[in-house]
Curated annotation (Swiss-Prot):
This is Na(+)/H(+) antiporter NhaA. HAMAP family: NhaA. It is found in: Cell inner membrane. The keyword Electron transport does not apply. One of its GO terms (molecular function) is sodium:proton antiporter activity. It catalyses: Na(+)(in) + 2 H(+)(out) = Na(+)(out) + 2 H(+)(in). Residues 32-58, 117-122, 177-180, 223, 273-286, 351-357 are periplasmic. Na(+)/H(+) antiporter that extrudes sodium in exchange for external protons. Pfam families: Na_H_antiport_1 (PF06965). Signal peptide: none annotated. Belongs to the NhaA Na(+)/H(+) (TC 2.A.33) antiporter family. Keywords: Antiport, Cell inner membrane, Cell membrane, Ion transport, Membrane, Sodium, Sodium transport, Transmembrane, Transmembrane helix, Transport. InterPro entries: Na/H_antiporter_dom_sf, NhaA.
Length: 388
């Protein structure tokens, strides 16, 4: 029990469970004995009915639309906390990770488009390598233990949170189709109710969650991706402490283990099961997976390093205390771990077009993410001196 408690207390535990879930999915999807069961599980229909309102989706879509909304609720809470009290609370603190994140989104997207611009279908996946899997990246960094300067951990977390915020904006602007104005109207009313609750100082988290369920349903029916409802709810839950208690921090504390040890691993299990049948070197080096691999493995560190260098040269920001530029470059490589966020965007980009494209995209994401994890970890291990 002591070893189990030590494992779950480690920052690396969430990343390790993610890896196990992804490997298990790959094994089951490629085994004759279990592939049928794996796909049957994902296609299991689940129906929710309240009066005349009916939501009928398969298990995969419930995981991607409902459970991931809880993940984005946690992201919303984290972003709000960092903006108001944490590493993004002042312009001086926020400048370096914000500039790094912008470079880490622009350059991978441009590199992907360099491979895929001529194809109007695969071009839609330009945002896939712009994402970073915060849990996976922090998990890999945690494997290095106490050698990692606290400032470097905070930099990676701030960068990844801004990256997540960028991904949310991208999803809202570029991966939303066929809008239902009636449902958007209901969503607008729900958001207004959340704002009133916040302004009136209501601190009962359950009330916000209840309105959040209405908002999630309306957003789902509107054509906008339902996970955005989670972020909106997270922004409205009060952060300010009263009698030593903060509703937002308390909910963040409650949600974190559920997201790290259940929701993200379940998402990885449901989405990482790519069949390798028929996969060839020619296929893996075709424009879609190659663009993703190049974006994650080259574009991410290049964009982050280049924009950080420009920020330092132009005196727009300064290095976090106790870190070196070489360490920042290594963190840039770790940000190439797109994994769950990249898979999520790939499912939005190609889900209604061609399932085969999603498979090739997932292969590119897995190769790019694993390569980034191994290279980033190795580089940091060399660059960080053991603590005495």
């Amino acid at each position: 029990m002591k070893h189990l408690h030590r494992f779950f207390s480690s920052d690396a535990s969430g990343g390790i469970i993610l890896i196990i879930a992804a490997i298990l999915a790959m094994m089951m999807a490629n085994s004759g004995a279990t592939s049928g069961w794996y796909h049957d599980f994902l296609e299991t229909p689940v129906q929710l009915r309240v009066g005349s309102l009916e939501i009928n989706k398969n298990m995969l879509l419930w995981i991607n639309d409902a459970l991931m909304a809880v993940f984005f609720l946690l992201v919303g809470l984290e972003v709000k906390r960092e903006l108001m009290q944490g590493s993004l609370a002042s312009l001086r603190q926020a400048a370096f990770p914000v500039i790094a994140a912008i470079g880490g989104m622009i350059v991978p997207a441009l590199l992907y488009l360099a491979f895929n611009y001529a194809d109007p279908i695969t071009r839609e996946g330009w945002a896939i390598p712009a994402a970073t899997d915060i849990a996976f990246a922090l998990g890999v960094l945690a494997l290095l233990g106490s050698r990692v300067p606290l400032a470097l951990k905070i930099f990676l977390m701030a960068l990844a949170i801004i990256d997540d915020l960028g991904a949310i904006i991208i999803i809202a602007l570029f991966y939303t189709n066929d809008l239902s104005m009636a449902s958007l109207g209901v969503a607008a009313v729900a958001i207004a109710v959340l704002a009133v609750l916040n302004l009136c100082g209501v601190r009962r988290t359950g009330v916000y969650i209840l309105v959040g369920v209405v908002l999630w349903t309306a957003v789902l029916k509107s054509g906008v991706h339902a996970t955005l409802a989670g972020v909106i709810v997270g922004f409205f839950i009060p952060l300010k402490e009263k009698h030593g208690r903060s509703p937002a921090k308390r909910l963040e504390h409650v949600l974190h283990p559920w997201v790290a040890y259940l929701i993200l691993p379940l998402f990885a299990f449901a989405n990482a099961g790519v069949s390798l049948q028929g996969v060839t070197l020619d296929g893996l080096t075709s424009i879609l997976p190659l663009g993703i691999i190049a974006g994650l493995l080259i574009g991410k560190p290049l964009g982050i390093s280049l924009f950080c260098w420009l920020a330092l040269r132009l005196k727009l920001a300064h290095l976090p205390e106790g870190t070196t530029y070489q360490q920042i470059m290594a963190v840039g490589i770790l940000c190439g771990i797109g994994f769950t966020m990249s898979i999520f965007i790939a499912s939005l980009a190609f889900g209604s077009v061609d399932p085969e494209l999603i498979n090739w995209a997932k292969l590119g994401i897995l190769v790019g993410s694993i390569s980034s994890a191994v290279i980033g970890y190795s580089w940091l291990r060399v660059r960080l001196r053991p603590s005495v």
